[in-house]
Structure formats: C-alpha cells, structure tokens
Amino acid sequence: MFFNPKKRYDFRMFFSGLRMASPQPSPSRLSKYTTMGHRYLSRWVSWSGTIVTPPGSPSRSSPSEGLSLSPQPPRAFQPRSRASSKASNMSEKTPVAYPLVPKLPVPPLGHTLTWYLTHLRPVLREDEYREAAAIVDEFGKPSGVGEKIQEELIKRHDALDNWVYNWWLDDMYLSVALPLPVNSNPGMVFPHQKFASDLDMIHFATRLVTASFDMKERIEVGDLDVDRCSARERYQPMCMTQYNRVFSSYRRPAIPKDKLLSVTDYQQENQHIVVFYKNHMFRVEVVVEGSRLTHQQVTAQLQEVLRAVDEYEGSDPPPVGIMTADNRRTWAQSRQILAGEAENQKVLKIVETCVLVLCFDDPLPTRFNLATRTSHRASLTKRSSNMNMNTQNTTYEDSKTRDEVNAGHQMIHGGGFNHNSANRWFDKTVQFVLTRDGWCGLCYEHSCAEGIVVIQLVEQILQSIASETHKEPGEECLPEGLVHPVEVLPERRHSETSAPVESVATPTRLEWNVTPVIHRRMQEAADHVDRLVEDLDFRILRYLSYGRNFMKRAKCSPDAFIQLALQLAFFRNHGQLTSTYESASTRRFRLGRVDCIRANTPQVLAWCEAMVINAPFADRLAKYETAIKLQTDIMVNNILGRGVDIHLLGLREMGKEMGLPTPEIFSHRSYQVSNHFRLSTSQVPTLSDSWMGYGPVVPDGYGASYNPHPDYIVFCLSAFNSCEETSTLEFGRNLERALDEMKFLLESRVK
C-alpha cells in the first residue's frame, strides 16, 4: 500500500481485502458493563470517623514480564529519600523511605450488606427490592456462605499488602476488552498556548519532554514529598506507589486479559521517547550514555522529525497505531501477528520501553463538532445569565476558531482515522498531544494510576515550563492560566552533554514489516474507531454563577453538593435515579486505588422528588440537609476503607477461588442493576484552567467529570449519540437548573 503523507485520504480506498461487517446492537451488550466499573479518576480527600450505617438500618452481625516483558507485582513502597503532595498542600521530608501506610481493611460483612441494600432501594421496583433483600439476608446469615467467604478474605488480608488490588485491576481494566479511547483513556486539555510558528510548538514540546524527565528522575531518587491528608486525620501519609508507575508502565494487549508491564528492571532502555507525526514514528533519545541532552539537542531532533516527514517522498508508513484503538482482544491477536517478524519485535520493544509518546497532530476541523457548537449557540440565545456551555461566546460566533470541545475530542480519541486516531499509541501511559493552533493536552492510559496523580504530575510539569527554570534565551511561549503556585522542579540530576547534537543522537525512523493480514486488520480497526468517534456526544459546561467557595460558605462538602446536583439533573431528565459511580481515593492504604461513592439513596430520591414538585421551601431544605449529610457519610466510609463495591468484588472473587457455586447475590438481576452505572462521575480538580474528560461507561449512560474552582465549575459531559434516551445538551441544561435552585435554597445561610 502506498500513501501520500501530504494529503488526507480515505483509508478504506487502499484496501481490497475482506471488510468486517458492522456489529449489530445486542441486548447482551449491556451485560459487558456490569462489572466493568469506571475509569476511576481519583479524588483525593480524607476524613476521620467511625463506621457509618444507613439511617434506620438494622444492625447486622459480622466477623470481625520486567521487559522480557512480563508483568511485575506491585510493591507497597520503595526506599526513597523524599516524597510530595500538591493535593494536600502539606508535606514532610522523609529521609529514608516512604512511610509504610496501613493495609486496606476488610469491612464488616453486615455493614457492607446493609449499605448495599440502601443503594439498591431507589433503583429497583418494590417487588424486585423485596426479592433482593431476601437474597442478601440469606447470604449474610450467621454461619452462611457470606461469613465463610469473609473468613477467607480476612486470611487473604493478613497475607497480602492489599487483599483486593489484583482482583480490582483485572476487573476494572485488564479483563475489559473495550477499546481504550472513549471507554477508558481520559483526555486532558491544557491551557491554550499561542504558537507563532512551528518552532514555538517544538520548543513547548521539548519543555514537556524535559520537565517530564526531570519529574521521572525525582520519582526514581525519592525527591517527592509524601502526599498527606489535608482534612480530618490531617498529615496522615498516603501511598505513593502510583507515581512510580506513570513513566515506567505499559498496558500490553493479551488473551484472555491485558498485562500491565513494568520497565523498571530495564532502566537503561527507558531513556527515550517515541514521536508521532502524520502516522510516522520515530525514536528520539533524551538520555545518551547517562547524560541528558540539552534543550537545544532535543529540539533539534524534533525539528528533524517534522522536516523529514514534511519532505518525505517515499511510501506512506502503515498506520499501525490505529490498531491500539481497537477491541483489546482483537489488538492482542494483531500484535501477535506483528511480533512474528523480528523487525516488528524491535519496534514494539522500543514503544513499550519508552518514557512517553509525543504526538504532533493536525488540528481537527471546526466542523468536527459543528452539531455541538450549533446547539450551544441555540442554548445561549435562550439564556440571559452568565452561565454558558463554553469558555467564550465569541468562540461560537467565529467558525474559523476551534473551541475547547473540539480540543477535547482531539485529546480523547484523535478524531477518527482520517484525522489523528492513527497518530497515537493508546497503550502507553503518557501521550502528550500538540497542535499548531495551540491546543495541547494529554491522553493517558488509566490502569497504572488514578487521574489525580497524573494531574498533579502534569501541573508541576506545566508550572516548571512557565518558570524561569526551563526558559531558554529567545523563547517566549509560556503556558497561560497557571495562576496558582506549584512547586518548581529542581535542576536535572543527569549531567548535560554539550556536544553537537549530530554527534550525540539523531531521531530513528521506526519501520514496520506489514503483511496483507495486518493491512486488513488496520482497515477494520479504522472502521471500528470511526464508529466509536462518531457516536461520542461530548460537551463542556462552564457554570459561572458560583464555585466551591459558595458551597463552603453554605457549610457543605463541595463534592457532596455537586453529587446531589448531578442526581437532580438525572432525575429531571429521566424521572428516576440510577446507579451512580464516583471514584473515592483509598490511597491512605497500602497500594490503595479507589472505591465507589454512590449517591443513589432513598434520601436523595426524596429530595429530588421534593425539588421537582416544588414542595414548600422548608420541606425542600430539610430533605436537602438529610440527603447531603448522608452523602458526606458515604464519602467518609469509602475513603476510610469501608466502601461497598470493593468488598463485594472481593467476596465474589474469593468465592470463585474457593470453588463455591456463584452465590445468588451475584447472579440476581439486582447485582447487574447495581453495577450498571448510567451516571459515571469523578472530581478532577486542577490549579490551572485545565480539565479532563472521558466517555460514558455504559451505552445508555453519561460521563460527568467536574472541576470545582473557587468561583466557577467546569463539567465535562459525555453520552452516546446512538442512545435515544441520553443527551448532553438536555443533561447540561438540567444541571445548570439544579445548581441555580440549590443556590436559591442555601443563599440565606451564606454571608
């Protein structure tokens, strides 16, 4: 196959092989998501307190391949000299090692089952609930199967650093076959840059690379401060192992499940990056013989990459990267075929061992999200308040200017095959994306770390770029919007070579040996990705009337407040509540990741009903007080290791390992309903005006990340166009309305 790198083309025209038929919708599709969970963008927060039980609930008794390339077991902590938390803004230097935080507890069985029923009640019919309650009671009865499994879980807790980590990782990520873009990998959009030329863009890219390697070195030598809790149980240390994995992990497709690889045992090979431009791939050295290249030397290599591609007159490279966006088991099969060629094995190893991927993209056309832009304009003309669904109204009036929704599509999936989706390698943890018009960001593979860890690293990287530490003479392009102080990275520890770049390193073009079978698979992957991209309904809502400062003055947890607003918006859209996911960080425990904060409770349902029928003010306020107090209690339970979902997952998997028949609690329809998250949410706070978004986790659901700033809130809303029941436009309107009404409800207490 021959491709012209200087023009865009329809990939399908170049293939005459077998075409895969479009998959037909199937009711069974929903079942794929019942245990998939969420993309777990972790909210850091900590509280103290005793186990909280639902109001009015009866008491229940309960017993107290390293790069050959094989997956590496997680380690609870590693020797460090220091460690930080910009999340908590509280730090303590630890001269010897990270503190050994406690193990994640196994919650009491009765506690978990009681809360499970509390969350089931508002999402089941009364007859279904009674049936589910009987099944739960049977499972939890004294000397019953639940207690037997619980006893084995406690033994597992005593034997392992984290009793649920491997089960959770498999269930939420590695066993899920869905494509990574939209379904798993979040996209992060940075503050908009002003590039006067390609050289400006390249300088910014070099700074991203240099600052990332600075951060990687700090992680390796233990030069981070220990993340610590900032609320109740203040200063309690948090587990730091997620930082270790950000620049040294790779998600390899495999059968029957993916593998999360570590390259820490191959440190000498983990000193380069891979650069994509117009689907061409290059290896670019950053450390040579133990010495870091200078800013000018890295810049020269990146300039050479762009020059070589723009002047290239040979056959176009096969767009192998598009296959990383396909179904994971399909990509695993394709990878096996690729690896059958020795040259391809070398290229795969280069990609798998790189520190990060750098993608120079073509900007998506403004028409890409024209339907969203048009509906935004229509929405804005109907409103006279200062709330809007975009950064600036003028963006919508200027059809030649890309908006941030367009940029969000660019970071999440690349826009499809004929745009940039093949200019990616979605398996790699960190992919920086840059475009000539100044929209830059990140697409990151989620299995190795939570969003807050990645965001903290990225914000320190962006702040270091804005500082004098990394400014080179004659370079004026600095990030906008970084107004809050973040620790500036220290000077790099590697010695810098000053030798001419030609004598140190030049970019190496990565060549693939592609068979007709792989050509057909690339075509099929392009078809699949394009359908996925076309199906995504994505929208940014900037709510400008107030932010977290108002919520705090109203003596409310901002997170609980926003969760109630999301519930009210969903209730207005659909006339009911739904199983809701919000990630809750469990990093105060060893190898902690996240549990699920659920907002679907009878108390929230009662408040939503009162709001919709415009009940008397006193009634609405009283029910709000009850609902938000309970929501805060649920948050407390989760971050203290008393969540429901992780424990149920452990009970289910432990039963399998014991060889027991599947308990009815896990086969009953109520369990499927409980895990069908039509509302998948997460708080992703940033200091700069950056934001992170993702797709829904079920076909008839919404994705809703939120970033509460002091005086405004940024929501990233997503749904699927193929679902007639969902609409981000309508959901966004009802979310604005909910926030307006909640302000009216609480204004009297705010001084």
Where are these regions (language model features)?
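Long, Pro/Ser/Thr-rich low-complexity/intrinsically disordered regulatory tracts in eukaryotic proteins
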Residues: 2-5, 10-428, 437-438, 445, ...
